[in-house]
Amino acid sequence: MKTEHEEQRELVRWFRQTYPGTLIFAIPNGGARSPATASRLKAEGVVKGVPDLFIPAWELWIEMKRVKGGLVSLEQDAMHAYLRSVGYQVMVAKGFEDAKQQIEALRNEVE
């Protein structure tokens, strides 16, 4: 079973090959940190619940989860609701294949 990191890395690689002129980038909010590092990052503006990836040109945030067992936290759910309320799209994907299918479906709607 692939980790969320592996699934996300695969998605970013596929996306950059498929849509080379469209920027996608990661928001490294997650992960274990020391209390001092967490405090410093919070002071710099890191906020709990921000999705893993952003595609500015499409106004699309992507929350990656593992295929099995990946759950959206309360903070993530609240952030997703906020982002949608201000006009962004938010996608929750269970692994690379799910994310790829959702992105392709979204692009088919636009075209």
Where are these regions (language model features)?
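Catalytic phosphate/metal-binding cores of nucleic-acid and nucleotide-processing enzymes, i.e., regions
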Residues: 1-111
